[in-house]
Amino acid sequence: MTNALPPRFDITADEIDLVVAEFYAAIRHHPGLGPVFAVHVTDWPEHEAKIARFWRNAILMERGYDGNPFAAHQAAGNVRAAMFDVWLGLFDSVLKRNLSAQTAQSWSELAHRIGRGLRMGVEAGSVPGLR
């Protein structure tokens, strides 16, 4: 079955899988982000497969992802807005190591747009209701 929409940019599913695997390997070793993820992720291969499906959906227009990243990050309880800069910096370094400059830039721009939305959701979720 072919996708109705073209990919956002030139990348393969295998390249997406590689980036996701390397990113989460780096996350697990990061002194600040590793513990945040460790509280929530008990099955890393399953988590990586889910996130790879998210990116294949967002980039390749494959329809295999079922989830709500905004709700997941809000519900986590230990995700702070300031973490997104570190998170995205780490992601960018993985992109640059594994992809062509143009593909890394295209994916980085998409990740930063999504990251801004996630950050706003976390910030909005931390504001107390005044009514």
Describe the role of every protein-language-model region.
Residues 1-131:
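Core of compact, soluble alpha-helical bundle domains
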